[in-house]
Amino acid sequence: MTAEQTTSPSPATESRAATDRPDGTPHDPYLWLEEVEGDEALAWVRARNAEVADTLETADEFAATERAIREVLDSDAKIPEVSKIGDRYYNFWRDAQHERGVWRRTTLESYRTDDPEWETVLDLDALAAAEGESWVWHGASVLRPTPEQLAAGEPWRHALVELSPGGSDADVTREFDLVEKRFVAPEDGGFHRAEAKGSLGWIDADTVYVFTDFGEGTLTPSGYPRVVKRWTRGTPLDAAVTVYEGTDEDMYISAWRSHTPGFERDFVHRSKAFYSDELYLAERTGTPEQRLTKIDVPDSAEVGVRREWLLVELRDDWTVGGATYRAGSLLAARFDDFLAGDRGFTVLFEPTATTSLAGATWTRHHLVVNVLDDVKNRLHVLTPPDAAAPGGAVGQEAADAPWVRSEIPGLPALGTVAVGAVDPVDTDDLWLVTTDYLTPTTLSLLSLGEHPGDAGAPEVVKSNPAFFDADGMTVAQHFATSDDGTRVPYFVVGRADLVAGAGEGGSGTGTAPTLLYGYGGFEISLTPAYSGALGRAWLSQGGVYVVANIRGGGEYGPAWHQAALKANRHRAYEDFAAVARDLVARGITTPEHLGMEGRSNGGLLAGNMLTQYPELFGAVIVGVPLLDMRRYTKLLAGASWAAEYGDPDDPEQWEFIRTFSPYHLFDAEREYPPVLFTTSTKDDRVHPGHARKLAAKMLGEGKDVTYYENIEGGHGGAANNAQAAHMAAVHYRFLAERLG
């Protein structure tokens, strides 16, 4: 039963007088829903949420689904991920007893046991209760003591804790004492940054970089900091010294210090647009000013400096120093030599037709390169000349001894492998996280040793429990053919008979309830990962889960992403539609039993599947979406995404943007599958008005629309496990009822 069948007329269908604006653009009759916390808008939201409570949430299955998911999220058996700070290992943890979460620490010896002894550092539930705030943890940064302080036995003391009210991107930063386990009040000289988008970063124990909202004119059009300052303890914020000021057109300005002993350096980062950045070396001159030296690489490149090395990851081809380097390559040069004018590079990675760079992680002596090969991870250890023993050279020699390649033994052939350095300043230890759709996540500890080939076998430290019975289930990877002939990979997960389909010897019925998920933007790759919630609420109930690796993502490097930018956005949607058709052609499901879901940029994908390909789906979930592409640059952080979608205020660009703006593509005369819109009032990244307005427009035309908006949660949708379980249950029950 749909919402419009169970409720009387309400603001859900109310539009306002339609008159054109002075600039000629059509009036938006649902503009009032952009008032995030306006009385009328919130009344509309509450009415929609009440409809969900009266329909989806009343079924017995809803409570069971919510409970099953909550058990996964609250499980004490989950892997507690840790970060090494000094000789302790810190973890932030949520469970049934710690709804907001607890920041805690232990030793490595204790962490290796089945039941570690945790020392509470900060109880967020107690803090929220004491201060009357719905605090959501945004993380902490800790100042590394100097070598002299460490030699004298001084502890790691100075932390900067970031907390968000309700889960918004805007947060506060407060200084915290790790020894005394308390906040350092501003009246006691503690650093405190008021709520805004921005941050603080340690320079030394009495100085920080601050980039935040300093008042009128100090934010970019995207709502991010435009000014970075150096702030001294005990002085007012307005006395902080400006280090760098961006332009009115920039996206984000920030600064930080690298505290690696012997390689202490300061940097200023200028983000001009989403894929256009500048990095400056900031050197003290003995005056309040700092001398800035631009790192002379393409603005489209990703740049990193570690100890004596400069790493450059290319998004575009680059000709320099008499050589041309391909987009997607990873280059290395000695940083000081580069600053002196040397443009010789060593190629550490060069992409192929099936491979792309997923990441590069430094340890004390090595660089671990993570490569995706047809969306499967492969790891390589590269050792720079100063630490290398004789062995096979990597890439091209650049007036220097070669880097040396070695391999990590004992890794799975399939699935996802994520890499994290335990302590990149002092050790060559690695955390390895391995996972796939049906295998619970495992955390291993690996010591690479100082020299190539010294690595031992990974030591399994923690494993998640099996939250669902995967016996009889399987994972398959297939390729669909898009409209222009491009092969698009996708993974299918579920019972073996259902995954096999009804054709070519398969024993399936061809009508399996199937959820197809995608994203397709911002260079983000979708790789296999275990989800206890998905397994319990969908796979164990006979559902099939599919992940489409469409263009716009990062699965095959920069070219794969750039193929779906701006005027070519339609390629991402054609890819997704091709996967949907391939699932039907393989006899796995039918359009009536095929649902799809996308969030954020994936919500834009979902909106386009809904409005451009409604015949392919039996249900659509549109989560925290962009939908009104005429106004997206004017809403919250939207201006920062013009490099991805284009500028709707440019008439020529609007001509192609309008072809993927679901709010404008909706046609009251067309038939659409049932749709669920979800968002959060506290989302200050993607405006909740996107979801509100299209839902209202469709409800006004009598379409089958379900709408749920969490009052907290930010762009992630939920502020705690209870909210996350509830939101997920809404999703799965909607799909179960619509897809059969």
Role assignments for model-derived ranges:
Residues 1-429, 435-439, 445-446, 454-455, ...:
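Beta-propeller folds
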Residues 96, 166, 193, 201, ...:
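Active-site-proximal structural scaffolding
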Residues 120, 242, 544, 704-706:
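Conserved beta-strand segments of alpha/beta enzyme cores
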Residues 126-147, 155, 163-168, 182, ...:
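Cap/lid segment of the alpha/beta-hydrolase catalytic domain
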Residues 201, 209, 266-267, 280-281, ...:
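Structured core elements
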Residues 353-376, 432, 436, 480-488, ...:
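C-terminal substrate/ligand-recognition segments
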Residues 534, 547-740:
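Active-site-proximal cap/loop segments of hydrolase catalytic domains
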